[in-house]
Amino acid sequence: MLITERKHFRSGRIAQSMSEANLIDMEAGKLSKSCNITECQDPDLLHNWPDAFTLRGNNASKVANPFWNQLSASNPFLDDITQLRNNRKRNNISILKEDPFLFCREIENGNSFDSSGDELDVHQLLRQTSSRNSGRSKSVSELLDILDDTAHAHQSIHNSDQILLHDLEWLKNDREAYKMAWLSQRQLARSCLDLNTISQSPGWAQTQLAEVTIACKVNHQGGSVQLPESDITVHVPQGHVAVGEFQEVSLRAFLDPPHMLNHDLSCTVSPLLEIMLGNLNTMEALLLEMKIGAEVRKDPFSQVMTEMVCLHSLGKEGPFKVLSNCYIYKDTIQVKLIDLSQVMYLVVAAQAKALPSPAATIWDYIHKTTSIGIYGPKYIHPSFTVVLTVCGHNYMPGQLTISDIKKGGKNISPVVFQLWGKQSFLLDKPQDLSISIFSCDPDFEVKTEGERKEIKQKQLEAGEVVHQQFLFSLVEHREMHLFDFCVQVEPPNGEPVAQFSITTPDPTPNLKRLSNLPGYLQKKEEIKSAPLSPKILVKYPTFQDKTLNFSNYGVTLKAVLRQSKIDYFLEYFKGDTIALLGEGKVKAIGQSKVKEWYVGVLRGKIGLVHCKNVKVISKEQVMFMSDSVFTTRNLLEQIVLPLKKLTYIYSVVLTLVSEKVYDWKVLADVLGYSHLSLEDFDQIQADKESEKVSYVIKKLKEDCHTERNTRKFLYELIVALLKMDCQELVARLIQEAAVLTSAVKLGKGWRELAEKLVRLTKQQMEAYEIPHRGNTGDVAVEMMWKPAYDFLYTWSAHYGNNYRDVLQDLQSALDRMKNPVTKHWRELTGVLILVNSLEVLRVTAFSTSEEV
């Protein structure tokens, strides 16, 4: 017997999540009939908040950044940082004279985004003048779909029996809250998305949702909150909270149930539901209503031996206890939640009291529903993957993150798929199943090795969520179009338990359009899409492994051997001769005090030596050197070591390098991708030099993520850029990473640092924290890096291009704190060694000193 599930529309709004990992659903859906809540779907949000996407700065940068479309979709909340980056030349302006509300003020302008260092007109984004580029830019396809839909308007709902939409009143006047909602969707500090896969498969948006969450604010009149794409609803009765107070309800469902609840006597029949409440000062209980994936069989014995229970826990992994206030009718359960807490986990299970023969498992007493969800990309491509998800309940989210996608025999980073359709069927007992897929269209085929997949009996008994992948491909070079394929589920040597067909979505718009054009028109289209700006020709020098010639040396006046080793500091005996990289000095904290240090080389190691512990001599005065040879390769390998431990913003790195590197082939060769050729770019439709550079960077990112235990993306990229003599670009990247990492290390200590750097007042400090405050009115400890980063970026912007001064002043300020983080975190000291060694590296390693 087949049971076809009805499709639900997704509902939601932008909301501040309770942790960085919480992801918010942002599409429109069902409304509440009980509260005066204003509906605000995403199109309205964009059109009615022009100040949230304000154009500032020089419009010429639109041309400068060909990756704007991707960045504005992934990081629209970085607009204020952009302002600072564009205005860095204002070196003489005191930070104390500026508006402390820099990161939360409203700006009166409109109709554009501002993110990651460049500006873009939204209308220009919608026009998509380049057919090729539009094919690559489907990382913003979800945003384009939203902007295209302008017909929706604000409306107020006063009835009491509709589903509650989010209260957006608090967002309307809080620009930072909107930005923070985006931030909770995108993990800012360490982006590990497979951007190479995204660029090849338009429609797998870079800012996709990893899991569905809904958060609503309900007043004393009550209402209902429904999890999108589900039959899971929490009803808030009238009088639940006092007049003037609000209850914030957040719902999230996990497909994988707790494993300890699945065994012979028990099986879960619903997803694990997380309910988070913002107000525990309540007067009425909540009512949970949800559909479950099983019914007790009608025979008297099953009715006596089996019970459907709702289990409750304060932790995701248990322990769980049975709730008594439950009512079940057919496949629906209602649970009265009396003992409320801020975080609750609930799951429904069928439990048997005993298993007398011939019963073997709980399955013998119930009609168990098994569901299959078919997931794929938003648009189909000449080659794409379909994922079949099998679970023991009827909840299938509209989007699903798959983390074990394979490419070239290797696992790549997680990819988000869209729900194409779902089907449910009854299974009498757990048993081995085989799933087969057949294309109903001769233009498409399923890879032979992937036509049939197996699901084991033990996986069904354990309640596991099973993902099976099927690879489709276009036959030869036929026309792209949507098509049907058939899915069949059958046990060994038995009749199929389920058989149904699925229709794919449309092809990627640019592929569909170009595939329908005659050959000569396609050629014209390619010419029309060619870049207008001339290619910048730069001849990069070749890195040479030469022996360093030191002009200055130092003879140590005493021995320094530390019991507790300190990274980046030299140890030496009295009378040792240390080669000095120059006469410049670095200020940094040592064992306990801030001192001045030379950067030197001793016994093949580069590090700091206290200025007062050495007597500087000339090269002619050197009598004995323990280091006979120290080459530029040795220098490069050591000075970049701190970069392995620095945090970075991937989108910023991608933008800067793509703009400042003008020869993709040189970059590819230095990174070890000399096998890449122009034919590789034909597959991804990369015409501009910057797009090819971006492709190389994304490939490096993907490879480093695959081998993340042994390879570090920022480290390898900086090494390559230094070998190309791109020192200005390297300095910019290093400063960006050092500032962000310092903010993360500081956390709540940023206030003390701000006072030491620029003597901020208490009111000015609070201005930085206001945008990041949670429901309690305070900034969570794990979120303290955000106001710290806002402040440090504002402060560093006033230095312009004086990156050495930024890093040195930051080091000195951190050292002066009561409990300096730099006593344990020495990477900033290592970065100071790096920037003070760049000139020596350039003079020796390159035959020319031209700046790039």
UniProtKB/Swiss-Prot annotation:
Alphabetized UniProt keyword annotations: Activator, Cytoplasm, Growth factor, Mitogen, Nucleus, Phosphoprotein, SH3 domain, Transcription, Transcription regulation
Q: Which GO terms describe its molecular function?
A: growth factor activity
What's this chain's function?
Answer: Acts as a transcription activator for MET and as a key regulator of HGF-MET signaling. Promotes cell motility, proliferation and hepatocyte growth factor (HGF)-dependent scattering in vitro and tumor growth and metastasis in vivo.
Q: In which tissues is it expressed?
A: Preferentially expressed in metastasizing tumors.
Where would you find this protein in the cell? Cytoplasm; Nucleus
According to the entry, every stretch annotated as the ZU5 domain falls at 212-349
Q: What is its main location?
A: cytoplasm
Q: Sorted alphabetically, which InterPro entries does this protein's record hold?
A: DEATH_SH3BP4, SH3_domain, SH3BP4_C, UPA_SH3BP4, ZU5_dom
- Name the Gene3D superfamilies for this protein: 2.60.220.30
Q: Name one GO cellular component term.
A: mitochondrion
What organism does the UniProt record list as the source?
A: Homo sapiens
Gene Ontology terms: biological process: positive regulation of cell division; positive regulation of transcription by RNA polymerase II
Q: How does it assemble?
A: Interacts with FASLG.
- Kindly indicate whether the keyword NADP belongs to this entry: no
**Protein name according to UniProt:** Metastasis-associated in colon cancer protein 1
Indicate where the modification Phosphoserine is found in the sequence.
19
